[in-house]
UniProtKB/Swiss-Prot annotation:
It is found in: Mitochondrion. This is Probable D-lactate dehydrogenase, mitochondrial. One of its GO terms (cellular component) is mitochondrion. Belongs to the FAD-binding oxidoreductase/transferase type 4 family. The keyword Heme does not apply. Disruption phenotype: At 3 dpf, mutant embryos show no visible abnormalities compared to wild-type embryos. They do not display any ocular abnormalities at 5 dpf. They nevertheless exhibit elevated levels of D-lactate, but not L-lactate compared to wild-type larvae. InterPro entries: FAD-bd_oxidored_4_C (IPR004113), FAD-bd_PCMH (IPR016166), FAD-bd_PCMH-like_sf (IPR036318), FAD-bd_PCMH_sub2 (IPR016169), FAD-linked_Oxase-like_C (IPR016164), Oxid_FAD_bind_N (IPR006094), Vanillyl_alc_oxidase_C-sub2 (IPR016171). GO terms for biological process: lactate catabolic process. It is an enzyme of class 1 (oxidoreductase). GO terms for molecular function: D-lactate dehydrogenase (cytochrome) activity; D-lactate dehydrogenase activity; FAD binding; flavin adenine dinucleotide binding. Involved in D-lactate, but not L-lactate catabolic process. It comes from Danio rerio (Zebrafish). The lineage of its organism: Eukaryota, Metazoa, Chordata, Craniata, Vertebrata.
């Protein structure tokens, strides 16, 4: 079932431990208390909560999906506690839902079958920093902003920035990216090793315990197996990440265009010219107007590119010269520069606040972000067609995107109580995803599959690939306890084994 059908149809009974075979003991108060007591023996009383407010908080993310909350929330402080808690869940066949900061956009933390939420916020240590090797190992409670604050005096930084201050292990779990991906890659290119607790409590080091080579040809790439697995294969309890030197110089610019076509054509030509641009973000006229209103800015209300250049002063001069020539040839305006750190931060804050700026267009409504990605040569066509589709169907959906790697979002704002609008938006999102697939792209560039795109995943990769994924899942999690119902459709495995 796709996103908007969930939005209007999902209702779930809220009974304790409705999770497969656990139904047999859910009605037995003594058995429930025994399970909770087992959890408390691992974490202490403060590490377990069955309070409704805490459960509700941990049963939702930033998406429009609203299922049911978990039955219990646990707060482990170490990988040993995560392992011990997982073993208890495995014994009682209780679903496990990992929770980082709750900033996901595809319903990845919803407890479809109840069960136990593992909130990892108390595991917040930077474990190892190797400045000379440009790598760091972090626990799952460390966010991207807190890591970069920690690194501030080292001359290093971690560039992957999905916008929200997400947990780094959560970013690995969803293969997140962001505005810097065109230059520095996504999480998939920046994770060197993972420590993962499997469904039965086993602790796995995907590249070998303590290993952190910049490259390896040793066996199957287990690290990349877990990057993007969305908590369905295990709980990521440590991530070893690549770091980068802070560039000698950074400068940002804004350029306005007469049309969507000219702005996106410029993007493609800049990349084809080999300019190592650090960021190149597209905002359509609706989005730039929303950003102006929300952030008290005054950019021209036309299709716009936000750009950023990194490097030495000499190399940036060359990058800027080539880029300005291309944008000028496509009818772009003179660049409005943001050179000092404060001005650059204000510009990129406006871009990262796009979600909230879009929501402010219709106060009281809900927002949903699409997330398709296509080969960059197809980008002009798909954005122009998508813009026309939004207008013809009277949908509020400002467009913003990391167009340097072919990824863009429609930040759709809708009234969930208006069934006609919900249906129009649902139909639009299906058309958009299939338009991307028809152009050799993907239904999700960075948000993940979660709940809403499981059917589209099958269309994208085909039934054989889905069966291979199911086989991998069954091998690592034969009872289907790890975040069941996400990425792959729910099965009855955990009621049968």
């Amino acid at each position: 079932m796709t996103l908007f059908r969930h939005l209007v149809r999902i209702t779930s009974p809220r009974l304790p431990f409705i999770c497969g075979s656990s139904r047999r003991f859910s009605a037995k108060t003594a058995a429930v208390e025994r399970v909770v007591s087992s959890f408390r023996s691992v974490t202490g009383d403060e590490g377990v909560s069955v309070g409704s407010a805490v459960r509700e908080q941990h049963g939702r993310d930033e998406s429009v999906h609203r299922c049911r909350p978990p039955d219990v929330v646990v707060f482990p402080r170490s990988v040993e506690e995560v392992s011990a808690l997982a073993k208890i869940c495995h014994h009682y066949r209780l679903p496990i839902i990992p929770f980082g900061t709750g900033t996901g956009l595809e319903g990845g933390v919803g407890a479809l079958q109840g069960g136990v939420c593992f909130s990892l916020r108390k595991m917040e240590q930077v474990v190892d920093l190797h400045q000379e090797d440009f790598d760091v190992t972090v626990e799952p409670g460390v966010t991207r902003k807190s890591l970069n604050s920690y690194l501030r005096d080292t001359g290093l930084w971690f560039p992957v920035d999905p916008g929200a201050d997400a947990s780094l292990c959560g970013m690995a779990a969803t293969s997140a990216s962001g505005t810097n991906a065109v230059r520095y890659g996504t999480m998939r290119e920046n994770v060197l090793n993972l420590e993962v607790v499997l469904a039965d409590g086993t602790i796995l080091h995907t590249a070998g315990k303590g290993r952190r080579p910049r490259k390896t040809a040793a066996g199957y790439n287990l690290t990349n197996l877990f990057v993007g697995s969305e908590g369905t294969l295990g709980i990521i309890t440590k991530a070893t990440l690549r770091l980068y030197g802070v560039p000698e110089s950074m400068v940002s610019a804004v350029c306005s265009f007469p049309s969507v076509q000219s702005a996106v054509d410029s993007t493609v030509q800049i990349l084809q010219a080999g300019v190592p641009i650090a960021r190149i973000e597209f905002l359509d006229d609706v989005m730039i107007n929303a950003c102006n209103r929300f952030n008290n800015l005054s950019y021209a209300v036309t299709p716009t590119l936000f750009l950023e250049f990194h490097g030495s002063s000499k190399s940036m001069e060359e990058q800027v010269s080539v880029t300005e020539e291309i944008t000028r040839d496509n009818g772009g305006s003179d660049f409005a520069w943001a050179e000092d750190e404060e001005t650059r931060s204000r510009l990129w804050k406006a871009r990262h606040d796009a979600w909230y700026a879009a929501m402010a267009l219709r106060p009281g409504c809900k927002a949903y972000s699409t997330d398709v990605c296509v080969p960059i040569s197809r980008l002009p066509q798909i954005i122009v067609e998508t813009k026309a589709d939004l207008i013809s169907n009277n949908i509020t959906g400002p467009i913003a995107g990391h167009v340097g790697d072919g990824n863009f979002h429609c930040l759709i704002v809708l009234d969930p109580n208006d069934t006609d609008e919900v249906q129009r938006v649902h139909s639009f999102t299906e058309r958009l995803a299939r338009r991307a697939l028809a152009m050799d792209g993907t239904c999700t560039g960075e948000h993940g599959i979660g709940l809403g795109k499981r059917a589209l995943l099958r269309e994208e990769v085909g039934p054989l690939a889905i069966e291979v994924m199911k086989g991998l899942k069954a091998s690592l999690d034969p009872r289907n306890l790890m975040n069941p119902g996400k990425v792959l459709e729910l099965t009855q495995t955990n009621t049968e084994q």
